[in-house]
Amino acid sequence: MQPSVYYLTPDYDLPSWGIGLLYKHVEILRSHNVNAFVLHHNSGFSIDWLEADVPIAFLDDPSIEIRSDDMLVVPELLAREGITVGGNCRRTVFVQGSYFVLQPFNEAISYRDLGYETAIAVLPHVKDVLERHFDITATVVPPFIAPYFFCDERGSEGHSRQQRILMFPKLGYREAGIFDYEIIRKLLQRDCRQNPPWKLLEVSGRPHREVAALMQNSEFMVSVNCLEAFNTTVPEAMAAGCLPICYEGFGGQDFLVDDQNALVFPNNYVYSLADTAKEMMVAFEKNSSLLAEMRTNARLTASTYSEENTKRALVALFGDLGY
């Protein structure tokens, strides 16, 4: 019997491209004749914001039998739970954010000692962290940006866009005592009122394609997320021609270049970021040529995160693992 691959996935129904990638990995593997499944916890759970045609198995289904030659792929946030699922099956940990590795644990861990035989890392800096600090060999399988975020060349130059700045609140930051979002939101609200027709729009809980359309019709996106890997909304905005004004966020070191493909600030330099955002509003016409060049560069950067590149790396990895 052909061995199977199960992607353990949280029962979380809000839009999250991190969860979307779990589904898309399964979709890619199945298109290459790997018997792969999304594995949710509770029967009947589903998400409605993502377009993905994949079979879903459920942990509470007594008919599910994970065999010793099957592979369980576990996101880093579920790594502690993952060692209790699937008996003596093979295990791979899928790390999308190095900051979250230790969240499920009370002390530093070795993934190998926990029973994980290998790791998938979304970006080079994540691979480096895993191999230096968590005792596991990692393979980079890069993320990709959903193709419907990419605008045509005319769109990337900012034509027919609203003078609008998008922000995406992220759960957990305020609770963690990181107040940058509230500071920049209040400052931008005032700056937009003082510089019509500029508007600020906070976006949350919307379908993925609707987010893409908003980005393709907006000039800027502000992100003050600071504990990130891919920080998906930033490269999505780059693809859509919606120029990011953002923190590096740690993970951005792998693809952000200040004044070339984004306006980039060190983490927590919230007032410097606010100064630049206001300047972009006030001197928008004056900066039009510079902004057009940066949008083009941003789109080129985003284009390197293609589904084809993800597919190539993922299929090669599972081929090496014997699937």
Residue spans of the language-model regions?
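N-terminal pre-catalytic "stem/leader" segment of glycosyltransferase-like enzymes
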Residues: 1-71, 250-252, 264-265, 304-308
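Conserved catalytic-core segment of nucleotide-activated headgroup transferases in glycan assembly
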Residues: 18-21, 128-136, 140-208
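Extended catalytic core of nucleotide-activated donor transferases of GT-like folds
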Residues: 37, 41-116
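Short alpha-helical segment that forms part of, or immediately flanks, the ligand-binding pocket
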Residues: 212, 235-239, 253-254
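Aromatic "clamp/platform" in nucleotide-sugar-dependent glycosyltransferases that forms part
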Residues: 226
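Short hydrophobic beta-strand element within catalytic cores of glycosyltransferases
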Residues: 243-246
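Conserved acidic donor-binding segment of nucleotide-sugar-dependent glycosyltransferases
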Residues: 258-259, 263-275, 281-288
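A charged, aromatic-enriched C-terminal amphipathic alpha-helix characteristic of glycosyltransferases
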Residues: 285-319
